[in-house]
Amino acid sequence: MKTLEKKLAEDFKIVFSDKELLETAFTHTSYANEHRLLNISHNERLEFLGDAVLQLTISHYLFDKYPQKAEGDLSKMRSMIVREESLAGFSRNCHFDRYIKLGKGEEKSGGRQRDTILGDLFEAFLGALLLDAGLKAVEAFLNQVVIPKVENNNYERVTDYKTALQELLQVDGDVLIDYEVLKESGPAHAKCFEVAVSMNHEKLSSGTGKSKKLAEQEAAKNALEKLQRGS
């Protein structure tokens, strides 16, 4: 397997000046915690920075591409692009999952393919790239990796899964649809929420996300898929 540095250079023409910064971006908290005595840095702070630069870059792209769209529509489109599932997909497409350093427990539990970890990794890489090479380098990378996917997948057709679920379930009359936070974890700047959706107090499904709203949408999406399968 190619080294991470070689892959970045060959596939994206990216060469990090600060090698430690790149290594930190690919170090999960579980790995750092298992090697506390070595005082290894993990990628949560870089993830915080990467999230901000991703939001900025995608917002700028959408603002320019869709001059007639209202703020609400642009916000929905951006949410679909930067949601956890999408970012994890971008990480996999770049084969970043092969290079992240995980703790033994996280590795055994399937962390290398977990959307939460891979989405955070993608943001951490963007944060590291911003610090090492600047905003133009981040924009160039996103133009290679994210923008083509956005244009091919037609994110203009944004689906509000909560509304779609409500419309589906209320065909047969009034029903009570409720969303409940099951779990809240992670540090203040990188929260993860797990939310359950129920109909008339009977749980349909659950979902996770970096905010309650995103977790609710994911729960509604999973419920729709479950109902469509007839299970």
Curated annotation (Swiss-Prot):
Residues 160-229 form the DRBM domain. Keywords: Cytoplasm, Endonuclease, Hydrolase, Magnesium, Metal-binding, mRNA processing, Nuclease, RNA-binding, rRNA processing, rRNA-binding, tRNA processing. It is found in: Cytoplasm. InterPro entries: dsRBD_dom, RNase_III, RNase_III_dom, RNase_III_sf. It holds the Pfam family Ribonucleas_3_3. It is an enzyme of class 3 (hydrolase). Its cofactor is Mg(2+). Mg(2+) binds at residues 47, 120, 123. Its EC number is 3.1.26.3. The active site is at residues 51, 123. Belongs to the ribonuclease III family. Digests double-stranded RNA. Involved in the processing of primary rRNA transcript to yield the immediate precursors to the large and small rRNAs (23S and 16S). Also processes some mRNAs, and tRNAs when they are encoded in the rRNA operon. CRISPR (clustered regularly interspaced short palindromic repeat) is an adaptive immune system that provides protection against mobile genetic elements (viruses, transposable elements and conjugative plasmids). CRISPR clusters contain spacers, sequences complementary to antecedent mobile elements, and target invading nucleic acids. CRISPR clusters are transcribed and processed into CRISPR RNA (crRNA). In this organism endogenous ribonuclease 3 and Cas9 are required for correct coprocessing of pre-crRNA and the trans-encoded small RNA (tracrRNA). This is Ribonuclease 3. The gene is rnc.
